[in-house]
Structures are given as structure tokens and as C-alpha cells.
Swiss-Prot record:
Belongs to the PNP synthase family. Keywords: Cytoplasm, Pyridoxine biosynthesis, Transferase. It comes from Nitratiruptor sp. (strain SB155-2). It comes from the Bacteria. Transmembrane segments: none annotated. It is found in: Cytoplasm. GO terms for biological process: pyridoxine biosynthetic process. The keyword Cytoplasm applies. Homooctamer; tetramer of dimers. The keyword Transferase applies. Catalyzes the complicated ring closure reaction between the two acyclic compounds 1-deoxy-D-xylulose-5-phosphate (DXP) and 3-amino-2-oxopropyl phosphate (1-amino-acetone-3-phosphate or AAP) to form pyridoxine 5'-phosphate (PNP) and inorganic phosphate. The active site is at H42 (proton acceptor), E69 (proton acceptor), H213 (proton donor). This is Pyridoxine 5'-phosphate synthase.
Amino acid sequence: MKLGVNIDHIAVLREARKINDPDPIEALPIVKRAGADQITIHLREDRRHINDFDAKRIIEYSSLPVNMECSIDPDIIDIVAQLKPHRATLVPEKREEVTTEGGLDVIGQYERISDAIEKLKANEIDVSLFIDPDIEIIAACADTGADMVELHTGEYANIYAMLYSNLSKTPHSIKSLELSRKELQEKLSIAIGDLENAAIYAAKSGLLVAAGHGLNYQNVGTIAAMANIIELNIGQSIIARSIWDGLFEAVRKMKEIIDEAGHCH
């Protein structure tokens, strides 16, 4: 199973002081040596972390394929088409959100998404759609001309954190998930089942399947063991771990956990 390392959070740290350090470009050889298969970046409309200068240099200098997350805004699609990353992953975007909150509305935004895909593919860029694990949405994805879907694991990750970490006892507790352990365990089983079923259906529909969002060293094993998922994109937890262990070791450890889980299924 492939690991895409999202390096946005290196730029988040830089932007906290609005200077040029740390530079995300310096992560590229370290991430590669540690065993990652892909670099992932998100060029947001508000440029809150990765900016156009970063994106251009990362795509130019990365010897690993670059997966560029972006919205379906026509101006952004034009920029991505010019930059020519290996892949573009289309994601929903709201300016006020802290991080991407849900999957693309592929059914409601079908025409706009199809237009974006057509433009990107004309520039020889593979396209993935970041979606909730929903069968109807996957059926629509298969018709858009996309090559891949990335299943949104955020709901699974949130339930897992409320069940197996101290999140519920902190200021970041998720109010909608302040439930009994039994209820959380039931919800977790459903979330895992939804992801497994979505991965199976997407693969049968001829789509490649990735997954990501909220994955960390504790919760990644279950997802990495799913047979139809071929790639995981993980960022914040790796960059957070790198503060303590260094970036090389943080990436290496994540890759090791993923590989071990993959051998178990």
C-alpha cells in the first residue's frame, strides 16, 4: 500500500510567523528516503499554508509523484493545469473551515466537477475525487471520468478518537460524539463497514481507491488492512510526530505500521 505524505503542516508552521522557515521543499528528500511513495499538498483558495510559489517548486523538485488537492474553482483548476502535478485530488472547500470537513457533493456539483476533470485530463493530470464513503456518490464518480476516489476517513477517525483517546476530556471534545462507549463502538463498526463497502464498490466500478483524513499512528491499521484501498494520504499526525522523533522517523514508522497491517489481511 502506498503512503502519500501531506506536507501542508510544515507550511502551517511557517505561516505562523509569516517568514520563510521551515521551507516545505526541504522535506522532499527526507520523506522519500523514509519510504513514502507520494507527496501531497493542498493549494487552498485562501493560500493559508501552501502557496503558488511552494506548489511550483515542489512539483518541479519532487522526485516522488505529487498529488495536489484543490477545489473545483475555475481559477484554481487553471493554476493546477499549468503546474501539472502527477494527480489532482478535487476536494470541497469552505473558507471558514479549519480543515476539509466532508466529501465532494459529486451529484449536486456533477457538471462543475466533470468540467474540472476534463480540463485536468486534457493536461495529462490524473484525477481523484475526495468523497464520503457513499455508494450513490461513488456511482456518480465513475461517470465523471475520474481515475480514483479518496474515501474520507474523518468520521471514522473522530469516533475512534472519542472512544480510544482522551479527546472527550479535552477542550477539543466532539460534542456530537459525546456518547456512551457502547454507542461509540456501534458507530465505529458502522463507519468501518461503510468504508469497506465503499472501497469494494469503487474498485468494482473501475476506480482506484485511496483513503485519508484524520488518520494517525493509532487508527491507521484498520484502514490499511482493507484489501481494495491502495493508498493512504496522511499529514498532520506525521508532521506532529516529527516534532518529537524527526521527520524521517515519523514517516518511516507510519510506513511500517501500514505495511504490517497490509500483510495481515
